[in-house]
A protein has these predicted regions:
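Carbohydrate transferase catalytic cores enriched for Leloir-type hexosyltransferases
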Residues: 1-401
Length: 401
């Protein structure tokens, strides 16, 4: 369906990152678009849905996109594919082939394509806006799966060259993008992630907190970490730091780790076995969105010893809940935490252990961090980020041929 060239342009959204289970990328895209959808004067939005041209029935994926469209105030635009979904997804997973159908090639009329997961359609000549979360594929290439590394190296430079505007999630990533690709300042917009302050807050109802304790078998005090289990999150050193805590501290505080299974995490499980911590480190698996806030709030300490972050969403969530945080100064984390968190050296398990013990053993420091966290987190709001996105789309609209 063609857009009216005399009216506002349509925003066409590539939804690949927003299928469940949501990662940080999918959560950012969904919440940002939800906030954008209620702004006055916003552009119409359409979610792209691909269907094999011989297929007529609605798939489960299409039904989910209809639900997502309702959440973000969009409609669904079905595009016909020339290959069944199984073949299409195998091509998407290959770093040697284009990840998008050929119907996203060529000019696209009075519309702006929004690609929330780094890469845009390589053959597209329409106005487009991608979102870049970090440059880990350049800074920590060994931490990625080989196919993901090759995919980004092949397609991201093309996307950046053809983009009308580029969204990044921190000033740190803006600087890195400019240094790596010589992109003009005016082409990049920093749009911070945020949290739902009605969910992530210190005064979460006691019944919600008790429910997650029962669900995840956490009856007493615990330390908490949440992220996909992958090398940049530095979980092996977190486990080594936990082992360095005094025995009475470990006996009082099990370490609960939540997050998707990830990749290249063999060193984490090897460290747990080597240190004999099988009964003290508890893996909770992927956590549904509704459980994140009460789990954060109930934790006595949140720890994220990342080697590199484009932002650090779990740090912000813990701060908003009033939970003390120990993290690192790597990547964009200081933009998030400021002086409301405690920083450790991610390469030194003794440093991580020392800061964890300092927070756990100092009630005055804990009270200060618990008070400072929500105040700092209050500056990150989806409404403000959505207004920034509106400005990006309005600027991109002026580039439509």
């Amino acid at each position: 369906m063609k857009s009216d060239p005399t009216g506002p342009p349509d925003i066409l959204i590539e939804p690949g990152a927003m299928y469940p289970p949501l990662s940080g990328v999918g959560y950012y895209a969904r919440e940002l678009l939800k906030a954008y959808s209620v702004l006055p004067g916003r552009f119409p939005m359409k979610i792209l849905s691909y269907r094999f041209f011989l297929k007529s029935r609605t798939s489960a994926a299409e039904k989910y996109l209809e639900t997502l469209a309702g959440e973000i105030g969009a409609t669904v635009e079905i595009r016909r594919r020339t290959a069944p979904s199984g073949v299409h997804h195998r091509l998407r997973g290959s770093a040697l082939r284009s990840p998008f159908p050929l119907d996203l090639a060529g000019p696209g009329g009075h519309r702006i394509y929004f690609f929330p997961n780094y890469v845009g359609a390589p053959l597209l000549r329409s106005t487009c806006v991608p979102v870049i979360y970090d440059l880990g594929f350049l800074r920590y290439p060994d931490a990625l799966r080989a196919r993901d590394h090759l995919y980004l190296r092949r397609y991201l430079p093309r996307t950046l060259r053809r983009a009308s505007r580029i969204v990044v999630i921190s000033e740190t990533i803006k600087r890195e993008l400019q240094e790596a690709f010589s992109i003009p300042d005016e082409k990049i917009a920093v749009i911070y992630p945020a949290v739902d302050h009605t969910a992530f807050r210190p005064d979460i109802p006691p019944e919600a907190r008790a429910a997650v304790r029962a669900k995840y078998s956490l009856p007493g005090p615990y330390l908490f970490s949440l992220s996909t289990l992958e090398p940049r999150k530095n979980f092996p050193r977190l486990v080594e730091a936990y082992a360095l805590l005094p025995a009475d501290v470990r006996n009082r505080y099990p370490l609960a780790v939540a997050g998707g299974e990830g990749w290249k995490n063999e060193a984490l499980f090897a460290a747990i076995r080597r240190l004999g911590l099988e009964d003290r480190v508890k893996f909770l698996g992927y956590i549904p969105g509704a459980d994140r806030a009460p789990l954060m709030r109930e934790a006595d300490l949140f720890v994220l010893p990342s080697l590199y972050e484009g932002f650090g969403m779990p740090v912000l969530e813990a701060m908003a809940c009033g939970t003390p945080v120990v993290t690192t100064e790597r990547g964009a984390i200081p933009e998030v935490g400021g002086e409301a968190v405690v920083y450790a050296d991610p390469l030194d398990p003794q440093s991580i252990a020392r800061e964890m013990a300092a927070v756990l053993g100092d009630p005055a420091l804990r009270r200060r961090l618990s008070a400072a966290g929500p105040l700092r987190a209050a500056a990150f709001r989806w409404e403000a980020s959505a207004r920034r996105l509106a400005g990006v789309f309005e600027s991109a609209a002026r580039d439509i041929p």
